[in-house]
Amino acid sequence: MEVHEEQVSAPVTGDATAKYLLQYILSARGICHENALILALMRLETDASTLNTEWSIQQWVDKLNDYINAINVKLNLLGYKIIRINHGIGRNAVTLKAKQNFESFEDNTAIRAHNNDYAVLQSIVLPESNRFFVYVNLASTEETKLATRFNQNEIEFMKWAIEQFMISGETIVEGPALETSIIVKEVNRILVAATGDSNLAKWRKFSTFTVGSTNLFQFQELTATDIEDLLLRLCELKWFYRTQEGKFGIDLRCIAELEEYLTSMYNLNTCQNCHKLAIQGVRCGNESCREENEETGENSLSQIWHVDCFKHYITHVSKNCDRCGSSLITEGVYVI
């Protein structure tokens, strides 16, 4: 997808605001953090001299959602849609990462408003948010969705790579997880807050739906150079992501486009709380938590939660797994 720099030079209102918001999402390769869109909307309202400095942040969120809904009315006719998807690593972790990467996600963001010809500096405190807006193809099959951007060999590589990610995620590794993992840090913080025990022993099990580049270079239908170039492009398009350790996994755009395909094709169990696909978060560590699928006879993976869903579950529901009864305080698995 061609990338266009955002240019807003004239006052905009109504349909024009919706148009610019759509352009902004497309300029971000079709996936945009909620706070970035709130800031873009504020900028548009400022240029149109319609910025209401008295609005709460929730009113801005509501107005953004109204515009997205209006955009979707027209996009649906073309076979596209902007969907809302929450990142599995949680609000706190996403916000921390966003602050590190983009100046626009600072807690106190200056928005210049015009009131009676005077410039008024209004400080806006953006919320913690793990919500992203993703521009997706509503085509009926995964092949059709991918064919608009990738050739057949590239599509076959993506399907093969995704299978490798899923196989990797089935394996629970015994031993300490990476202390540098933002998921490990966030889960440990949640456990301490839930128990009040700052000396709580860290879990010694983890799993990961990621695979190293060396393994991915084993694909036979493309050269190593082609695979390297494709991986870079997939990361740019937010289909895959690359970890600090050089491993690759599926990113939000891939989940948004192919969630139904992934859950059915690979017999993945969804988050116990929100029932959406979860490939980062927390899994029950008790082996007896695995259930046998009545249709296939295969054992499913144990219960899994997104980070925020896990926090809600152990805080408001139970500190024990509802399937096997084991303690989630001591018998958990980091899914990183």
Curated annotation (Swiss-Prot):
EC number: 2.3.2.27
Catalytic function, reaction form: S-ubiquitinyl-[E2 ubiquitin-conjugating enzyme]-L-cysteine + [acceptor protein]-L-lysine = [E2 ubiquitin-conjugating enzyme]-L-cysteine + N(6)-ubiquitinyl-[acceptor protein]-L-lysine
GO annotation (BP), single: regulation of telomere maintenance
UniProt key word Plastid: no
GO MF: ubiquitin-protein transferase activity; zinc ion binding
Broad class of where this protein is predominantly found: nucleus
Zinc finger (RING-type) residue numbers: 268-327
GO terms under cellular component: chromosome, telomeric region; nucleus; Smc5-Smc6 complex
Cross-referenced Gene3D superfamilies: Winged helix-like DNA-binding domain superfamily/Winged helix DNA-binding domain
Any Pfam family hit: SMC_Nse1
Keywords per UniProt: DNA damage, DNA recombination, DNA repair, Metal-binding, Nucleus, Transferase, Ubl conjugation pathway, Zinc, Zinc-finger
UniProt subcellular location: Nucleus
InterPro entries linked: Nse1, Nse1_RING_C4HC3-type, WH-like_DNA-bd_sf
CDD domains hit by this protein: RING-CH-C4HC3_NSE1
Subunit note: Component of the Smc5-Smc6 complex which consists of KRE29, MMS21, NSE1, NSE3, NSE4, NSE5, SMC5 and SMC6. Interacts with SMC5 and SMC6. Interacts with NSE3.
UniProt family annotation: Belongs to the NSE1 family.
PANTHER family tied to this protein: NON-SMC ELEMENT 1-RELATED (PTHR20973), NON-STRUCTURAL MAINTENANCE OF CHROMOSOMES ELEMENT 1 HOMOLOG (PTHR20973:SF0)
Role this protein plays: Acts in a DNA repair pathway for removal of UV-induced DNA damage that is distinct from classical nucleotide excision repair and in repair of ionizing radiation damage. Functions in homologous recombination repair of DNA double strand breaks and in recovery of stalled replication forks.
Record protein name field: Non-structural maintenance of chromosomes element 1
Lineage, uppermost ranks: Eukaryota, Fungi, Dikarya, Ascomycota, Saccharomycotina
